[in-house]
Each structure stands twice: as structure tokens, then as C-alpha cells.
């Protein structure tokens, strides 16, 4: 790790501390993710190795943050015979994320909506990145604006905090004891379903889409119960007809029977094609949700010059 100079701690990721650092030889900025690893006798656990090779494979897409290399640091532990081991994942450094970007349009001296063309461009890249991950059998499971990094001058979006699903399980609280946000979590996950698939990410993509249009979260719940109420109030309480098996899910209660509202009211500035795409992302039945790959061919993107992607 001598070849990097840590400049500042930029956050506590879901899996450990994140530093902005400079590669001393080149002056290149990188993001260092320090992950805590329980070492076994053989060294790095095979699950972690699998995840890292997955990350390297996914890095081939321009819409996924690039994993540049992995540094393995041993620190002999004074208390016991074992060595404490840290794994540093070295990623390309990006200066902002979608949450900060949306906030810059909402706050500040000159608040204004994001241009429809810009939303379209960012959404296309997000769907491309998610389609890439899904085509390799990887679910993100925690997509949110904070995990989408931006190269502002190029209007380029990249998915971060990816793939560390099984070796580093997503905790309910992060290391700083911030509650991990529920705003982008799919209803089947909130209801305790253990079998979930690519639809969980597409629900999150829909919530992010609406948030770019509204400049505020679509479903800002502060508990799992509240989160479901937010969803049901807008989209109506799901029925067995709409979503077979919903009433058998672990945390299903008898909720008030709300009728669905017109989604247009939540995103008044979105074009009819945009509302149609959003509706397909926010289907209750995960099997009916549009896939990322199919979304790329949706009429909402017809006016976009796709050759630039």
C-alpha cells in the first residue's frame, strides 16, 4: 500500500471505509475500499476471491466502476497468533454521485429540474450497466443514487458498490450505524421473500428514474412497514390477481385496501413514454417487471442517439 497516499476518507461504504487516494508514481486519483476480512488458514476466503473475480469481469463495462487492482495487507495481531488481514480494492475515482447531482438541482441559488434529455441519457446508461450485470448473473441488490457515480463533464454514469453480495453480506446498518436506506427496496424484499431475482434491481431503477424527474424520493419510508405504506398508497394495495403468492409472504399483513393512484401525478413532467417505462419497472409481480435489456428498446429511448453508448 506504500504506492498510494491516502488523501481523505470519503465515506463508509456498506462494506468498510472508502478513501480518496493518489497513486504516488502517476498522480492518478483512485478510490481505496478497505474491506475487513475474516482470514482462514488458507488465506483469503474463496467466497471473497469469487466476488473479486466477478467484479473484475463486470469492470469490462464502461457503465460499471472499474476495479483496477486488489491489494492484500497483512497486519500481525498483537493479541493473538492470527494475522489481521485487510483487503483493499482499488477502483477508479469519480468525483460525484447521482444523489449529490440531483441535490445540486434541488438546492443552491438556482434550483431547476433536470433536463428531460439528461434524464433520458443517464437512464439509458443505468439500464445498460444493470443489463451487463444481469447478463453475468449478478444482482446488485442495493441500487440507489449514492451508488451511481458520475463523470460530470462527460455525463457518464457508472454503477458502484457492486457484486459484493455474498462474501460481504449487505447489513441492515452500515459501519457508521446509518440505517441502510429502504427507499429503493422492492416490495418482495420488504415482505421477506427469500427468492428474488433481477426484478429487485429493476424496481430500484424505477425509483431512481422517478427521483431524477421529481428531484426527491418517490417512496421515502423510514421503516419497512412505512416503506410499504408509501408504495401501496401510490400504486394501490397489491392483490393475489396482480401478484400471485403475495399474501403468503412472511411479512404480509392485512393492509388497508388502497386504490392505485395515477402515476402521472407523481411525475407530472415526465413524457407519456417515460411514464409507461416507469410503470413497467414498478410492477408488483417481479416476474412482470421489465428487464434492463428490454428497457433499452423501450420507445422512451427512441429519440436518443444510441450510437454514442
From Swiss-Prot:
One of its GO terms (molecular function) is ATP binding. GO terms for cellular component: cytoplasm; nucleus. InterPro entries: CDK, Kinase-like_dom_sf, Prot_kinase_dom, Protein_kinase_ATP_BS, Ser/Thr_kinase_AS. The active site is at 142 (proton acceptor). One of its GO terms (biological process) is cell division. Induction: Repressed by MYB88 and MYB124 during stomatal development. Changing residue 15 to F: Decreased kinase activity and disturbed cell cycle. Pfam families: Pkinase. Its EC number is 2.7.11.22, 2.7.11.23. Residues 4-301 form the Protein kinase domain. It catalyses: L-seryl-[protein] + ATP = O-phospho-L-seryl-[protein] + ADP + H(+); L-threonyl-[protein] + ATP = O-phospho-L-threonyl-[protein] + ADP + H(+); [DNA-directed RNA polymerase] + ATP = phospho-[DNA-directed RNA polymerase] + ADP + H(+). SUPFAM superfamilies: Protein kinase-like (PK-like). Phosphorylation at Thr-14 or Tyr-15 inactivates the enzyme, while phosphorylation at Thr-176 activates it. ATP binds at residues 10-18, 33. Keywords: ATP-binding, Cell cycle, Cell division, Kinase, Mitosis, Nucleotide-binding, Nucleus, Phosphoprotein, Serine/threonine-protein kinase, Transferase. Its main location: nucleus. PANTHER family: CELL DIVISION PROTEIN KINASE, CYCLIN-DEPENDENT KINASE B1-1. May control G2/M (mitosis) phase progression. Plays a role in regulating seedling growth in darkness via regulation of hypocotyl cell elongation and cotyledon cell development. Plays a role in stomatal development. Required to suppress endoreduplication. Together with CDKB1-2, promotes both the last division in the stomatal cell lineage as well as the number of stomata. In collaboration with MYB124 and MYB88, restrict the G1/S transition and chloroplast and nuclear number during stomatal formation, and normally maintain fate and developmental progression throughout the stomatal cell lineage. This is Cyclin-dependent kinase B1-1.
Amino acid at each position: 500500500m506504500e504506492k498510494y497516499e491516502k488523501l481523505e476518507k470519503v465515506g463508509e461504504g456498506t462494506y468498510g471505509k472508502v478513501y480518496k487516494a493518489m497513486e504516488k508514481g502517476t498522480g492518478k486519483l483512485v478510490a481505496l475500499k478497505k474491506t475487513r476480512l475474516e482470514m482462514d488458514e488458507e488465506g483469503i476466503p474463496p467466497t471473497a476471491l469469487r466476488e473479486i473475480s466477478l467484479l473484475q469481469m463486470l469492470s469490462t463495462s464502461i457503465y460499471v466502476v472499474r476495479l483496477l487492482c486488489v491489494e492484500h495487507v497483512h497486519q500481525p495481531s498483537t493479541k493473538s497468533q492470527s494475522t489481521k488481514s485487510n483487503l483493499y480494492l482499488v477502483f477508479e475515482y469519480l468525483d460525484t454521485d447521482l444523489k449529490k447531482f440531483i441535490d445540486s438541482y434541488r438546492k443552491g441559488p438556482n434550483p431547476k429540474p433536470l433536463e428531460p434529455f439528461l434524464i433520458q441519457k443517464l437512464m439509458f446508461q443505468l439500464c445498460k450497466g444493470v443489463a451487463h450485470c444481469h447478463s453475468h448473473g449478478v444482482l446488485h441488490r442495493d441500487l440507489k443514487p449514492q451508488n451511481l457515480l458520475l463523470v460530470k463533464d462527460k455525463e457518464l454514469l457508472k454503477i458502484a458498490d457492486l457484486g459484493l453480495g455474498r462474501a460481504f453480506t449487505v447489513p441492515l446498518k452500515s459501519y457508521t450505524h446509518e440505517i441502510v436506506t429502504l427507499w429503493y427496496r422492492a416490495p418482495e424484499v420488504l415482505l421477506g421473500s427469500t427468492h428474488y431475482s433481477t426484478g429487485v434491481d429493476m424496481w430500484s431503477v424505477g425509483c431512481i428514474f422517478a427521483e431524477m424527474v421529481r428531484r426527491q424520493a418517490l417512496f421515502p419510508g423510514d421503516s419497512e412497514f412505512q416503506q410499504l405504506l408509501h408504495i401501496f398508497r401510490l400504486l394501490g394495495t397489491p392483490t393475489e390477481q396482480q401478484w400471485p403468492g403475495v399474501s403468503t409472504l412472511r411479512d404480509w399483513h392485512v393492509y388497508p385496501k388502497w386504490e392505485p393512484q395515477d402515476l402521472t401525478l407523481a411525475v407530472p413532467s415526465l413524457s407519456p413514454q417515460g411514464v409507461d417505462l416507469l410503470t413497467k419497472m414498478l410492477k408488483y409481480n417481479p416476474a412482470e417487471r421489465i428487464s434492463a435489456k428490454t428497457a433499452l428498446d423501450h420507445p422512451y429511448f427512441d429519440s436518443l442517439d444510441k450510437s454514442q453508448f
